Amino acid sequence: MPKPGELTFVAPRGAKKPPRHLADLSPAERKEAVAAIGEKPFRAKQLSQHYFARYAHDPEQWTDIPAGSRAKLQEALLPDLMTVVRHLSTDQDTTRKTLWRLFDGTLVESVLMRYPDRVTMCISSQAGCGMNCPFCATGQAGLDRNLSTGEIVHQIVDGMRALRDGEIPGGPARLSNIVFMGMGEPLANYKRVVGAIRALTDPEPDGLGLSQRGITVSTVGLVPAIHRFADEGFKCRLAISLHAPDDELRDTLVPVNTRWKVREVLDAGWEYAARSGRRLSIEYALIRDINDQAWRGDRLGRMLKGRPVHVNLIPLNPTPGSKWTASRPEDEKAFVEAIAAHGVPVTVRDTRGQEIDGACGQLAATER
């Protein structure tokens, strides 16, 4: 467990590297990998078709590939990276949290949420998190390691398979939105997260063919990485986990603020919004008597007025051992009104998965 305020930007050394996976490679690299094991390069396209378009991970389903080649191709490009430990469901089974055991025994979680008009999946980009926010269960656990691109992508592939096969009530469906808001700070695992976005949005069969506009990447505010992300040319939405409008409080709630202050973080966010053409999201967990004062709502509204932005207020979800709790309804209402008075769009997030510790800030990946 990290000390209060301690930050970890680089994953601890010594972790075993995940096996190479199809999703880790570009289409050209997949052909090279297939040729390197003595198979014809076009097998790479067939394998991509099975994985990205049919969600078929089992070689027995690859009927257009000779039986003698399947095991070799699986070992080289589609190894078993992760297995399901368990599913926990709530909201009439329309919210499902999955606990995964990775190849090295590390545990991570993802959450699938079906609404009447859309399906959203919240995925993890790291095992644990090094940002050490004191109100977040993931942050309090510390950082174990980065996930590979393949480990990130496979969470979504499995979610899409589950939706197609009718495992979530409501009939077959397709993912509408992906949010990098599970375990980890996505921009601290920059290269692999960017690789995952490419694999998710490349047209089938090279990727999953999802829209960049349906993807949200959350960050506590790693300013250099936000500038770098703007250079990628993506149309994804950026969400900044702000949680306080003033540096004095944010230094405590979001320790990375001791490196990059609120103004620097927001300026980087405005640059991303301008270059991507997407509205910036501000995430703000409302904590009783800590950051939910109406004057802080007013200050936040003044800072955001006239900008391409939307504020998502999140009633604090309970975590084991936490001394904090959600705001009183009257304080939440006053906070919303203080922001809205400046013409800034603001909503209170519909909290899903709280009963199964699957809501924002609750992912801890334990087998208890």
From Swiss-Prot:
Keywords: 4Fe-4S, Cytoplasm, Disulfide bond, Iron, Iron-sulfur, Metal-binding, Methyltransferase, rRNA processing, S-adenosyl-L-methionine, Transferase, tRNA processing. Its EC number is 2.1.1.192. This is Probable dual-specificity RNA methyltransferase RlmN. Reaction proceeds by a ping-pong mechanism involving intermediate methylation of a conserved cysteine residue. S-adenosyl-L-methionine binds at G184, E185, S218, S241, L242, H243, N317. It catalyses: adenosine(2503) in 23S rRNA + 2 reduced [2Fe-2S]-[ferredoxin] + 2 S-adenosyl-L-methionine = 2-methyladenosine(2503) in 23S rRNA + 5'-deoxyadenosine + L-methionine + 2 oxidized [2Fe-2S]-[ferredoxin] + S-adenosyl-L-homocysteine; adenosine(37) in tRNA + 2 reduced [2Fe-2S]-[ferredoxin] + 2 S-adenosyl-L-methionine = 2-methyladenosine(37) in tRNA + 5'-deoxyadenosine + L-methionine + 2 oxidized [2Fe-2S]-[ferredoxin] + S-adenosyl-L-homocysteine. The active site is at E109, C360. InterPro entries: Aldolase_TIM (IPR013785), Methyltransferase_A (IPR040072), RlmN_N (IPR048641), RNA_MTrfase_RlmN (IPR027492), rRNA_lsu_MTrfase_RlmN/Cfr (IPR004383), rSAM (IPR007197). The gene is rlmN. It comes from Streptomyces avermitilis (strain ATCC 31267 / DSM 46492 / JCM 5070 / NBRC 14893 / NCIMB 12804 / NRRL 8165 / MA-4680). It comes from the Bacteria. The lineage of its organism: Bacteria, Bacillati, Actinomycetota, Actinomycetes, Kitasatosporales. Pfam families: Radical_SAM (PF04055), RlmN_N (PF21016). GO terms for biological process: rRNA base methylation; tRNA methylation.
